Amino acid sequence: MNKLGIFVNFWEKSWTINYPYYIDKVARLGYDILEFQAQPLLEIDDAKLRAIKKHADDAGIKLSYSLGLNPKYDVANPDDAIRAGGVEYLQNIVRKIAVMEGELFSGVTYAGWGVPSYFVDAAEKERLFARSVDSMQKVMTVAEREGVTVCCEAVNRFESPLVNTAAEAIRYADAVNSKCIGIHLDTYHMNIEENSIGDAIRLVGSRLRHFHTGENNRNVPGRGHLDWDEIFSALAEIGYKRDIVSEPFLQMGDEVGYDIRVWRDILENPTEERLDAEAAFLLDFTKGYLKKYGM
């Protein structure tokens, strides 16, 4: 069975978290993986990172790393200095993940998270693409040395103009042309951008390195209108054996609610107890589909 995880900001409304607390929580709930934003790792010394990794190992929890790249480190930016700073920033994150013996780093890694402040037409999108690929190839020199796969996540049009679909993710990975570039798909984003989620999964096929689940409105899978039979049957068809991490965002407020654009509590009265109950429902829901499709 695929290892199953949950994104820590299901509970936490800050990107900076109490790692041991949430490691223990997801272990008690029965998950295999805790995923969180990677950028706070840059502020933690290596000894403490190794202690966090040991705590996770002792709890039987795998750690997974994600990122929405701050625009001030935009590796696709027209400004040479911004791109160079972004390359160094991503390389340093890869090094920190390697300290924790991490294998994979995903998310909006290829450009600043969000829509650029300047106009993007078809010609500018090609220039964005070329600049990003050149930058990512420099990141790959460190990723290959450290043995960390960096995934490009196809996200919706409101979060990036560069990689919105599975086909665009494939084109990007082909251009970077490294053993350490991967493709990351997310059902929330695919629901917005793809004509068929199942076809998008099949198009990526064996190149799919990371997979996020979330409902049409950022809710817990099973609480919205996505066709989970279509999704899991496609994953089974391509023989997907890698991690599946759920990434619901249910709470408004603070930096996470603002950055994700959650303008209401999607779960009414989201106390920690209610969130824990939803996390338990989510785990059972996902395991049910894995069993149904022999995964």
Label each region the model flagged.
Residues 1-12, 16-29, 163-182, 191-295:
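Histidine-acidic metal/acid-base catalytic patches
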Residues 26, 34, 56, 86, ...:
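Conserved, mostly hydrophobic/aromatic
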Residues 3-5, 33-35, 60-65, 102-106, ...:
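Structural preference for beta-strand elements that scaffold enzyme active sites
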Residues 47-60, 135-143, 200, 230-234:
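Catalytic-core regions built around general acid/base machinery
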Residues 10-12, 38-40, 69-71, 111-113, ...:
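Active-site-proximal loop/turn and secondary-structure-junction residues that shape catalytic pockets
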Residues 17-18, 46-47, 76-81, 118-126, ...:
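Short, solvent-exposed loop/turn segments at secondary-structure boundaries
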Residues 57-58, 80-182, 269, 273-276, ...:
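Active-site acidic/histidine proton-transfer and metal-coordination neighborhood
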Residues 1-103, 126, 178, 264-295:
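N-terminal pre-domain/capping segments
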